[in-house]
């Protein structure tokens, strides 16, 4: 038993050390373009090791199974050597490819390089024969060297007998292996974003394990997007004419300044279906600009967050936030304001590594992140998902007042983002005002929000502040489900603060994703790169629509009615429109054009 454990431990540690060595070599190879210090190397290793530990466990599965089999069978030596050769080839190919391609791509190895195999001539056109031969030579030498290391250090397991203790050990080892691969017991599973820690993207990229990066992107491929191709692209363009207009022309003016400090709050799951238990929010609507027919783009926080902050559409079966190679190409409100001198920060009281949130936020211009790890141990466990909302609202208040005081001194501008989390299963909140636990959680959120607004209103910083309130998505609750999309997907969109010129209601159909263009239009800033975000107040917004998708279905509403099309069964489950055929074609065209854009990023 002891010898088997030592064998698995030797194999595992050698794999982890190989990954760490690859990080150091990667950094050294790019030192000329990306200088770093010795402390940077240590930080890259310390932040990246969690991903290395989990990735190494994937490759421990085969040795573990072989050692189990060896209790009953005398396995030939070539089985182990063959596996060592196989993983050595895989590792070295990943390391060499990653290190070589980074100079061209400036992002980590992912599955996108496979597309170049279809046109190898074009792929090799930008490099010399010597360049290729050198890398081929290095691959062969390093593969041989790594194989020898596995043979000499990991070696071969000794053969044992299938005693009950040996079998029990194997049974216990299996869940430990699964937990390690998953990344622990938390809500967040192992993902690339967990190793991001710096505003220097090179250091973040250095921390990422290239083998994991490739496997992760392979598991999030978009091969099934072909099912959304239903017509010629020229017909799509014709159908979409006037639907996605990016210009701000003669836009109505909502603000009394073009350079306010901006706060964007994403209210967890707080769809309009909970309006009756959120009376304070309804009162606030009378004091600001309420977009009364705003609809969520999707049904999950990761997708809604991207739609709100990047003005980008969501997709039925894909989360763009979970695809760093795609999300890093997106525009964002933060990037646009950062270019105008705004300092940006984001607060989320939960695990910011969940669904790759960290890498998305850093990659789209949010300079300073605050998450549950920045709170006390006691505060981190005040909610199932992390730090409960009354605590984080207070943290946000203190941050705004502190930053605004600095702004008064140096004239700087600020953009804050904040995601609440308590109004989510299991609905564990400290107050008990309603018997229904779900409604009680939203009443708690309503109280937290109102207390925050009242406190902020008493500060001098209120005068130049624009607060944008919206929900990340709606939820299925009681009799409101996916068969009632008008109710389920309806979310608040409210602009508040001293920067708002006067209260009013904007009653046009719109999506969360239209916030980016509408806000930047009000700030008189360009937003042409937000291809699918529309300035709702612009004279060019002549065809108001809203879209939402979930699972493998997409819903569309405009002035003629609504339609919900299920791509699994290839038929509409809802079709209530005076122009149903046109609306169906438009619905398909929207998804075809947006998925084409995603594939090309």
Predicted regions span which residues?
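Short clusters of hydrophobic/aromatic residues that line enzyme substrate/ligand-binding pockets
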Residues: 123, 427, 536
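Transmembrane and membrane-interface helices of multi-pass
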Residues: 2-223
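Short secondary-structure junctions
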Residues: 159-161, 368-369, 543-547
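Membrane-interface soluble catalytic domains
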Residues: 190, 499-601
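Residues that form generic nucleotide/phosphate-binding pockets
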Residues: 48, 52, 126, 152-153, ...
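Soluble catalytic regions of membrane-associated enzymes that act on cell-envelope
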Residues: 186-530, 540-541
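Short, Lys/Arg-enriched, disordered terminal segments
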Residues: 1-7, 405-410, 599-601
């Amino acid at each position: 038993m002891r010898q088997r454990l030592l064998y698995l431990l030797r194999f595992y540690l050698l794999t982890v050390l190989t990954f760490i060595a690859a990080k150091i070599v990667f950094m050294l190879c790019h030192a000329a373009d990306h200088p770093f210090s010795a402390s940077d190397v240590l930080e890259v290793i310390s932040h990246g090791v969690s991903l290395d530990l989990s990735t190494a466990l994937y490759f421990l599965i085969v040795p573990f199974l072989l050692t189990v089999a060896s209790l009953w069978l005398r396995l030939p030596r070539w089985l182990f050597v063959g596996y060592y050769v196989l993983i050595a080839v895989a590792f070295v190919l990943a390391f060499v490819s990653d290190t070589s391609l980074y100079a061209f791509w400036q992002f980590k190895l992912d599955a996108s390089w496979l597309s170049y195999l279809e046109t190898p001539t074009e792929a090799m056109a930008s490099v010399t024969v010597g360049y290729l031969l050198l890398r081929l030579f290095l691959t062969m030498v390093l593969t041989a060297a790594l194989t020898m290391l596995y043979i000499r250090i990991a070696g071969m397991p000794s053969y044992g007998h299938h005693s009950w203790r040996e079998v029990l050990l194997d049974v216990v080892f299996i869940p430990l292996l699964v937990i390690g691969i998953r990344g622990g017991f938390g809500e967040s599973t192992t993902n690339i974003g967990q190793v991001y820690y710096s505003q220097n993207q090179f250091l973040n990229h250095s921390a990422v394990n290239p083998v994991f990066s490739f496997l992760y992107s392979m598991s999030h491929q978009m091969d099934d997007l072909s099912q959304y191709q239903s017509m010629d692209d020229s017909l799509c363009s014709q159908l979409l004419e006037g639907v996605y207009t990016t210009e701000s022309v003669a836009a109505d003016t909502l603000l009394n300044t073009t350079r306010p400090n901006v706060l964007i709050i994403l209210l967890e799951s707080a769809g309009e279906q909970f309006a009756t238990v959120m009376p304070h929010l309804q009162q606030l609507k009378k004091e600001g600009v309420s977009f009364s027919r705003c609809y969520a783009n999707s049904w999950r926080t990761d997708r809604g967050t991207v739609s709100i902050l990047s003005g980008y559409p969501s997709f039925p079966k894909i989360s763009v936030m979970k695809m760093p190679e795609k999300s890093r190409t997106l525009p964002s409100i933060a990037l646009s304001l950062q270019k105008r001198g705004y300092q940006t920060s984001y607060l989320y009281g939960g695990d910011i590594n969940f669904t790759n949130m960290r890498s998305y936020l850093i990659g789209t211009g949010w300079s300073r992140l605050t998450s549950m790890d920045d709170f006390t141990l006691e505060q981190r466990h005040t909610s199932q998902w992390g730090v409960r909302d009354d605590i984080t609202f207070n943290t946000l208040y203190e941050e705004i007042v502190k930053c605004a005081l600095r702004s008064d001194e140096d004239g700087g501008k600020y953009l804050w983002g904040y995601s609440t989390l308590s109004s989510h299963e299991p609905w564990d909140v400290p107050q008990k005002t309603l018997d229904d636990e779900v409604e009680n959680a939203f009443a708690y959120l309503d109280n937290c929000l109102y207390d925050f607004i009242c406190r902020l209103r008493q500060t001098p910083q209120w005068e130049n502040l624009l607060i944008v309130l919206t929900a990340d998505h709606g939820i299925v609750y009681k009799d409101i489900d996916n068969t009632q999309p008008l109710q389920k997907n309806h979310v608040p969109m409210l602009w508040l603060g001293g920067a708002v010129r006067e209260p009013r209601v904007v009653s046009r159909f719109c999506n969360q994703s239209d916030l980016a263009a509408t806000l930047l239009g009000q700030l008189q800033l360009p937003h042409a790169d937000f291809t699918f975000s529309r300035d709702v107040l612009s004279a060019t917004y002549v065809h108001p629509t809203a879209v939402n998708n979930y699972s493998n279905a997409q819903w569309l509403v405009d002035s003629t009615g609504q339609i919900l099309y299920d791509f699994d069964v290839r038929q509409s489950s809802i079709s209530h429109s005076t122009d149903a055929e046109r609306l169906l074609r438009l619905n398909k065209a929207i998804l075809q054009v947006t998925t084409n854009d995603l594939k090309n990023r």
